[in-house]
């Protein structure tokens, strides 16, 4: 299904086209195949939800509210049907009781203040729409060469907190990890937890892995600034390059595996329009580089 949605402030809105698939046995975790053209958001919400009163987010009313991401299909009119796991989390972990409030997010920009109202049937009532904007002003997709072990988990949690729009795992010539379907599902759960904690409106999808060759073929386009983090090359610093460039509709940034990109991979990426950039004179670990790069982009976009 082709999904479109809006992101950005009232003065700057962009769109992202994304193809979503569903993991086997799961219907509530959208997985993006790849984010290409920028521009995000129209949700298929019912009129009764859209007509809920809108309240601007205030620190006094919402700063301590617990947040829960639900699938859009769990919301019918103004009622949220919770899964068994979600109800257990609210009741047993957070110790919420009937009548207690929390925040509901649909992962696609919708945020509501809700009240737990029927424990027997596991439902909550949406009370009002919350207007807030915590997303980056333009989409940033991180394409990450899969590190060994649990390294990818170390990357996606802080990068979700920093505002990454989507994650594209890469299989490179030096990649050792070949993830299973269970790994993909676990990664999406970690992203969901981080999105709830960091008060994101959008749930960054974790795509199915692509080979490096498949990836560079998909990225090309005049609306995309494609960046390749490299070492030991005479490349401009990431921050300096971004300051000198006209900001595009979206940014796609790729970071390499342990041992770095091969010469063939660097040449292929440059031939496909990627700009090599440096993160500094020091050699960063594969699990460190994505967070450092996104933090630099974040600081520039939000300054």
From Swiss-Prot:
Keywords: Cytoplasm, Methyltransferase, rRNA processing, S-adenosyl-L-methionine, Transferase. Pfam families: Methyltrans_RNA, PUA_4. It catalyses: uridine(1498) in 16S rRNA + S-adenosyl-L-methionine = N(3)-methyluridine(1498) in 16S rRNA + S-adenosyl-L-homocysteine + H(+). GO terms for biological process: rRNA base methylation. The keyword DNA repair does not apply. InterPro entries: Alpha/beta_knot_MTases (IPR029028), Diacylglycerol_kinase_cat_dom (IPR001206), PUA-like_sf (IPR015947), RsmE (IPR006700), RsmE_MTase_dom (IPR046886), RsmE_PUA-like (IPR046887), tRNA_m1G_MTases_N (IPR029026). Its EC number is 2.1.1.193. One of its GO terms (cellular component) is cytoplasm. It is an enzyme of class 2 (transferase). It comes from the Bacteria. GO terms for molecular function: kinase activity; rRNA (uridine-N3-)-methyltransferase activity. It is found in: Cytoplasm. Transmembrane segments: none annotated. Specifically methylates the N3 position of the uracil ring of uridine 1498 (m3U1498) in 16S rRNA. Acts on the fully assembled 30S ribosomal subunit. Belongs to the RNA methyltransferase RsmE family. NCBIfam families: PRK11713.4-1, RsmE family RNA methyltransferase. This is Ribosomal RNA small subunit methyltransferase E. It comes from Synechocystis sp. (strain ATCC 27184 / PCC 6803 / Kazusa). The gene is rsmE.
């Amino acid at each position: 299904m082709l999904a479109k949605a809006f992101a950005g402030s009232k003065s700057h809105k962009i769109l992202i086209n994304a193809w979503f698939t569903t993991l086997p046995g799961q219907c509530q975790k959208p997985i993006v195949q790849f984010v290409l053209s920028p521009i995000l958001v129209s949700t298929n919400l019912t009129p009764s939800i859209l007509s809920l009163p809108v309240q601007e987010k205030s620190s006094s009313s919402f700063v301590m509210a617990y947040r829960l991401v639900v699938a859009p299909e769990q919301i019918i009119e103004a009622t949220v049907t919770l899964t068994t796991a979600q109800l257990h989390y609210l009741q047993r972990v957070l110790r919420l009781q009937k009548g207690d409030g929390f925040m509901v997010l649909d992962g696609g920009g919708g945020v509501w203040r809700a009240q737990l109202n029927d424990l027997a049937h596991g439902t909550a009532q949406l009370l009002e729409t919350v207007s807030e904007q915590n997303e980056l002003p333009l989409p940033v997709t991180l394409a990450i060469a899969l590190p060994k072990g649990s390294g990818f988990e170390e990357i996606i949690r802080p990068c979700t907190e920093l505002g990454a729009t989507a994650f594209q795992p890469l299989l490179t010539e030096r990649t050792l990890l070949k993830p299973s379907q269970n790994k993909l599902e676990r990664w999406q759960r970690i992203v969901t937890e981080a999105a709830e904690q960091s008060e994101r409106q959008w749930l960054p999808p974790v795509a199915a892995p692509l080979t490096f060759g498949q990836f560079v073929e998909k990225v090309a386009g005049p609306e995309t600034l494609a960046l390749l983090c490299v070492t030991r090359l005479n490349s401009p610093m990431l921050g300096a390059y971004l300051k000198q460039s006209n900001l595009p509709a979206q940014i796609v940034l790729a970071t390499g595996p342990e041992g770095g990109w091969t010469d063939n991979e660097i040449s292929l990426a440059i031939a496909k329009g990627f700009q090599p950039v440096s993160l500094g004179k020091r050699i960063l670990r594969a699990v460190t580089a994505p967070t450092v790069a996104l933090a630099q982009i974040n600081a520039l976009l939000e300054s």
